[in-house]
A protein has these predicted regions:
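Active-site SXXK
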Residues: 1-9, 36, 86-90, 138-144
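Active-site helix/loop module of the DD-peptidase/beta-lactamase fold
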Residues: 3-41, 65, 94-129, 133
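Surface-exposed patches in mature extracellular/periplasmic domains of secreted proteins
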Residues: 7-9, 48-50, 152-154
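Aromatic- and histidine-enriched alpha-helix N-cap/loop-to-helix transition segments
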Residues: 28-31, 76-84, 132-136
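Generic alpha-helical structural context detector
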Residues: 34-38, 61, 108, 140-143, ...
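Active-site cradle of extracellular carbohydrate-active enzymes
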Residues: 40, 48-57, 61-119
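Penicillin-binding protein/beta-lactamase superfamily catalytic region
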Residues: 76, 100, 115-184
Length: 184
C-alpha cells in the first residue's frame, strides 16, 4: 500500500472479476482491501476450512461464493481465507509471490534469511497460515512491531501502519469474551 500498488479502497470484485460469481451480492461488490485487512469483509463465518479441503476450485472463487451476510466494515469475523485473497492481490499487482515480495522489504531488513510460505494449488502463498521461520526470527518481527516498525535503527514498516494495524477498527466483543458472553 505504501508503494502505491494497492490502495485500501481497491475493490475485490475489480481485482478478480474472473472469480466473481455470476450475480454478486451488493455486499460482495463493496469489499475492499481495508475490509480484508481488518477481517470485516462481511462474512459471518470463516470459509477457510472449505478451501483447505478443496483442491478443485479456486480458493478466491470459494471466498467470493461464501455468503457476505453483513455490510463490509461492520462485523469482525476471523477469516484466514481473506488473508489468502490479500496474498493473491499482492501477487497479481507485483507478479511475485508474497514471500518473494516481502523478502527485500521485511525479511532481509530483519536479518531473516531462511523463510518459506505454504502455497495453494494455484501457487499463491497462503497468507494467513503456513509461514515457516525460526522462533528467533518471529521474535524479531515482534520486536519490530513493539518498536513501531523500526529494527536496528531502520524503519522497516511505516509507524502509521503499525498504529493502524494494532488499533480497534470496528466495535467487537471485549477481549476475553466470546460472542455468546456478549449477549449476557
Amino acid at each position: 500500500i505504501s508503494e502505491g500498488l494497492l490502495s485500501l479502497d481497491d475493490k475485490l470484485v475489480d481485482m478478480f472479476p474472473e472469480h466473481c460469481p455470476e450475480d454478486p451480492s451488493d455486499n460482495l461488490k463493496e469489499v475492499t482491501v481495508k475490509d480484508l485487512l481488518t477481517m470485516t469483509c462481511g462474512h459471518s463465518t470463516d470459509p477457510t476450512y472449505a478451501s483447505r479441503t478443496n483442491t478443485e476450485v479456486s480458493w478466491i472463487r470459494l471466498f467470493m461464493e461464501h455468503p457476505f451476510t453483513h455490510k463490509p466494515g461492520t462485523l469482525y469475523c476471523y477469516n484466514s481465507l481473506g488473508t489468502y485473497v490479500l496474498s493473491a492481490m499482492v501477487q497479481k499487482v507485483t507478479d511475485q509471490k508474497l514471500v518473494d515480495y516481502l523478502f527485500p522489504r521485511l525479511f532481509r531488513p530483519l536479518g531473516i534469511n531462511n523463510v518459506s510460505w505454504a502455497e495453494s494449488p494455484e501457487g499463491v502463498n497462503t497468507g494467513g497460515w503456513g509461514l515457516f521461520l525460526k522462533t528467533e526470527d518471529l521474535a524479531k518481527m515482534g520486536l519490530m512491531i513493539l518498536q513501531k516498525g523500526q529494527f536496528n535503527g531502520c524503519q522497516v514498516v511505516p509507524a502509521e501502519w503499525i498504529e493502524s494495524a494494532s488499533s480497534a477498527q470496528v466495535p467487537c466483543v471485549p477481549a476475553g469474551m466470546n460472542s455468546d458472553d456478549a449477549d449476557k
